Every structure is written in structure tokens, then in C-alpha cells.
Swiss-Prot record:
Pfam families: Pribosyltran. One of its GO terms (molecular function) is AMP binding. This is Adenine phosphoribosyltransferase. It comes from Clavibacter sepedonicus (Clavibacter michiganensis subsp. sepedonicus). Catalyzes a salvage reaction resulting in the formation of AMP, that is energically less costly than de novo synthesis. Its main location: cytoplasm. The keyword Cytoplasm applies. GO terms for cellular component: cytoplasm. HAMAP family: Aden_phosphoribosyltr. Pathway: Purine metabolism; AMP biosynthesis via salvage pathway; AMP from adenine: step 1/1. Belongs to the purine/pyrimidine phosphoribosyltransferase family.
């Protein structure tokens, strides 16, 4: 018998997404950590969602479906990178990295945004796509909306159309959605 005759049937390693909504799956996997990173803060940890094959697939499928046809997917550093890469792969398009200031070499576009005590900046390489390209912007959490607002402005300054903004979790009481008025915002789960 030749070696090729003894092949085992291929194993299907694809995740089996349960017949449940993406929001129910995220809710079931989400960890709530009290007093992190400081006393009085209730931290919502999405890492168990991303670590679970069915959870990750449900999140990516949901965000891709909500985004419609796009030319690329942009992710905000850091967990937005994970979502954007997976969504871009699932959509058959490329991905753009919206980085913290000082992390990209060469020419960059920069947007600053206010923090509670100071300001921060994010950057993007210009000219990665044709002008007018439709880009889906993803991040893990929508809180105050400052980072996503700056990221959307950055993409628009680069000459791209923000086709939509998608997040896994929206912390609705922090009012971030209002800062993103004029954009189609999709949250899988809103608390």
C-alpha cells in the first residue's frame, strides 16, 4: 500500500456556532471584573469571547453582515486589530491598522482626541486604498466614543468613506453613540 492510500479523512476543524444570537453568546461569555483597573470601575472583559471559537465566529459574522459591502476593514489598536483582521479575511478584503501615535514608520495622518485627563493621538498610513474606498471601522468597545470618533475622522481625512462602525460591546450610559452621529453604528451587545 502506498503512503497516499493510507490518508485519513480530513477533519473539519471549523467552529460550530450554536443556534443562538451573537448578543446572547457575547453576554454568556463576557466577564465582569469589579474594581479594575481602579476601585469603582466595573470592567467588561471581552477576552473570553475572542478566545472561544464559536464566540469569535459569531462576533465576526455579525459585524461583517452589519457592515455591508466594503473595500477594507480598519481596526483600532489593540483588540480592534483582532476583529478587523478576522472580518477582513471573512470578507475577502484587506485590513487597515489605526495605531497609537508613534507606532507607524514613515508618513502618517494623525488625529488627536480628548481623554479624561489630557489627550491622545492615533495614526494611519495614507494612500493605502483608492480615494472613496468604503471602510468598515471596528473596535471592541464603544464607551465615550472619543477613539472611534477620531478614527472615523482619520479615515475620512485619508479620503475613505466610513461604511459603518461596529463594536462588540456598547456601554450605553457613557453616551459614545451620540459622538458618532452621522455614522451607522452597530453594537452586538449594549449594556
Amino acid at each position: 500500500m502506498r503512503l497516499t492510500d493510507r490518508r485519513r479523512p480530513a477533519t473539519d476543524y471549523r467552529c460550530r456556532v450554536p443556534e443562538t444570537s451573537a448578543s446572547d453568546l457575547v453576554r454568556s461569555l463576557l466577564l465582569t471584573v469589579p474594581d479594575f483597573p481602579q476601585p469603582g470601575i466595573l470592567f467588561r472583559d471581552l477576552t473570553p469571547v475572542l478566545a472561544d471559537g464559536a464566540g469569535l465566529r459569531a462576533v465576526v459574522d455579525n459585524l461583517v453582515a452589519a457592515g455591508g459591502p466594503v473595500d477594507a476593514v480598519a481596526g483600532v489598536e489593540a483588540r480592534g486589530f483582532l476583529l478587523a483582521a478576522a472580518a477582513a479575511y471573512a470578507s475577502g478584503v484587506g485590513t487597515l491598522a489605526v495605531r497609537k501615535a508613534g507606532k507607524l514608520p514613515g508618513e502618517v495622518l494623525r488625529e488627536t482626541y480628548a481623554l479624561e485627563y489630557g489627550e491622545a493621538a492615533i495614526e494611519l498610513h495614507p494612500g493605502q486604498l483608492a480615494p472613496g474606498s468604503r471602510v468598515l471601522l471596528l473596535d471592541d468597545v464603544l464607551a465615550t466614543g472619543g477613539t472611534l470618533e477620531a478614527a472615523a475622522r482619520l479615515l475620512e481625512r485619508a479620503g475613505y468613506e466610513v461604511a459603518g462602525i461596529g463594536v462588540v460591546l456598547e456601554l450605553a450610559d457613557l453616551g459614545g453613540r451620540a459622538r458618532l452621529a452621522g455614522h451607522d453604528v452597530h453594537a452586538i451587545l449594549s449594556l
